[in-house]
């Protein structure tokens, strides 16, 4: 049965200094991840953005270009196992993904000295960011943006789902599964979804053991609010009321757990892919407004800003 255990992507020795170029992010173990950067040379704020499952850094092209006109830089890398990274399709493990986030944030601070740095996570990326906040080596950020974070844990799933997942990942870990036939709409932006269906870098099926790894990560994110330290930076939580990917119940449980740490926006016409929905510009504007308030507070007081009260 050992040969049928879930497979993790290879990991090198942690002896490199994480660095950013215009097109790459070199990790602490020497892996080179594709990087995209949008923004002015001297931004007023910097966002390190993490994409969702099956996706890659191109997900942030529309919002990254829009934020550029508002003086905000966005840095997005292909997380391990996705896009043009090495070992596509193989799950890297939650700890490795969290280390990459912390290292990317530190490298961004070196690249843009003095600029406030924010971590943004969409779906799976949101699970990476949220779970990282509960760790002793949490990323050193001035604020966090969670966009429809993946928080559907085992405790929220039917027993049949949990059983099928374990059997598939431990019996046929390399078996590929897809969402075809589920009639789930991740967005109301049909042209965007059609473009993704033709994009060779978007993963149209997923290994069973990678799904198992994702659920492990969602478990950690789901329960992270209970372990957040008092030093947790302010959080902007964005969620669409028409999200068909992550159920509302665990999402609202996480919102409740975050309490006054988070400013919450629920979008009446929003789906899972909020940053690419038809009404995405409403979300972009809320995001920019929140960052502007956080930046103003940091500049005025020389400290991390205090969370605003929830709305929506």
What residue ranges belong to the model's regions?
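Catalytic nucleophile-loop/oxyanion-hole region of alpha/beta-hydrolase
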Residues: 54-57, 83-112
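Short beta-strand/loop motif that positions the catalytic acidic residue
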Residues: 231, 237-239, 243
